[in-house]
Design a protein with these regions (language model features):
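Short glycine-enriched nucleophile-adjacent loop
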Residues: 159-171
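Short beta-strand/loop motif that positions the catalytic acidic residue
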Residues: 227-229, 233
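Short beta-strand immediately N-terminal to the catalytic nucleophile in serine-hydrolase-like folds
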Residues: 152-154, 179, 228
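Active-site glycine-rich loops that stabilize anionic/oxyanionic intermediates
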Residues: 74-78
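Cap/lid segment of the alpha/beta-hydrolase catalytic domain
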Residues: 103-127, 190
Length: 266
């Protein structure tokens, strides 16, 4: 209980900082110049066992067989706030692909966090994971999505949920980008979630890899993974990025050393 109490105290101390970050992201570079993206809610997309909401952005003049990006918001955010903060809709308009934004509900989590640490919501064909899968199926049927070009990305809790979807449904995705997230299977309850976020308590790379391999019993090609994490992140410890990389290196039996190294701007 002492560990849980310390974690809760840390959460309370960081709440103000985190909310300021989210508000700044939602406002964008300037409230005078930010364009509010056009989102429409799709209410009927399946049995929705995870009780999530589905929002979609469809560019004008959408062509045949467009790509699809699934964008998962972080805690305290909404689909619309995440759309404004990330600019995904602007990119979709320029390049002609569809974006869907699953949205958490306070009845599931009072902070609007996706339930990446709840086994009933992270298993294949169960809970929130199945709801997101059903949203993808709805988008494929309604917008004629090219099923070879389905991608997923998410921030923080959304990044952790992107890890869930890539592990539970690897055959669905061409690739995914995990931003400030955590490895699949890194927590199965609230205490373990806090430990993974703040204390870097993590299973071995082999154990993490085994959890991905056993999630769907997948034998086909694995999706490509891109991992991003800010070094100043005070909500999710940046070392989680290394654990995600180690997990997927182990899953795909890759060498630890990169085949090519490119330095970008910071």
């Amino acid at each position: 209980m002492a560990g849980l109490r310390a974690s809760l105290d840390s959460l309370r101390q960081m709440r103000g900082l985190f909310q300021k970050r989210i508000a700044a992201a939602s406002r964008g570079p300037s409230s005078a110049t930010t364009t509010i993206p056009s989102l429409r809610e799709i209410a009927a997309f399946g049995s929705n066992p995870g009780n999530l909401r589905m929002f979609a952005h469809v560019p004008p003049g959408l062509g045949e067989k467009p790509a699809l990006v699934v964008a998962l918001h972080g805690c305290t955010q909404s689909a619309r706030a995440y759309a404004v903060g990330t600019g995904w809709c602007d990119v979709a308009d320029r390049h002609g692909f569809v974006v869907i934004y699953p949205e958490q509900q306070p009845s599931n989590n009072p902070k609007n966090c996706f339930s990446w640490f709840v086994p009933a919501d992270t298993a294949r064909d169960s809970g929130e994971a199945l709801s997101i899968r059903q949203m993808i199926e709805k988008a494929v049927s309604e917008f004629g999505i090219d099923q070879r070009r389905i991608f997923i990305t998410g921030l923080s809790a959304g990044g952790a949920m992107a890890s869930v979807m890539l592990a539970a449904y690897p055959e669905v995705f061409a690739g995914g980008a995990i931003i400030g997230g955590l490895p699949y299977g890194s927590a199965s309850n609230v205490q373990e979630a806090f430990d993974a976020m703040f204390n870097d308590r993590m299973p071995s790379a082999r154990a993490l890899g085994d959890r991905v391999r056993s999630a769907p019993k997948h034998e086909g090609r694995w999706p490509r993974i891109s991992v991003w994490h800010g070094t100043a992140d005070a909500v999710v410890k940046p070392s989680n990025a290394e654990h995600i990389v180690s997990q997927w290196i182990h899953v795909q039996s890759l060498q630890r050393e990169p085949s090519e190294l490119k330095h970008g701007a910071r």
